[in-house]
């Protein structure tokens, strides 16, 4: 087993600073790389305002409102309502309920 001590971009490093190309990556690193400066800055900025807000109708956040407007402006006119969910499971369950109600 190789103990990882740090990672940057597409590479991981062991305790001896030996560099390995990361073919496994993980959930977020696979698309943006390890320690991506833009992601670090966005996380830092967001964490200074709030970490998490439930957005199931009780509260809204500016980023979710902006995304909903962007989606509505770029989809067919009859697709103008957005409902954000917490996970793929909730999204799938919601889409099944909508399909059942529609048919």
Residues covered by each model-derived region:
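Active-site-adjacent loop/helix segments that line or gate small-molecule/cofactor pockets in enzymes
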Residues: 1-8, 49-50, 64
């Amino acid at each position: 087993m190789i103990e990882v001590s740090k990672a940057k971009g597409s590479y991981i490093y062991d305790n001896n600073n030996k560099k390995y190309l990361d073919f496994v990556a993980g959930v977020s690193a696979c698309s943006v790389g390890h320690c991506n400066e833009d992601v670090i800055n966005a996380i830092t900025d967001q964490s200074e305002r709030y970490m998490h807000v439930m957005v199931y109708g009780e509260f809204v956040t500016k980023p979710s409102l902006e995304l909903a407007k962007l989606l509505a402006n770029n989809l067919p006119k009859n697709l103008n309502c957005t409902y954000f969910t917490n996970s793929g499971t909730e999204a799938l369950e919601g889409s099944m309920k909508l399909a059942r109600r529609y048919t």
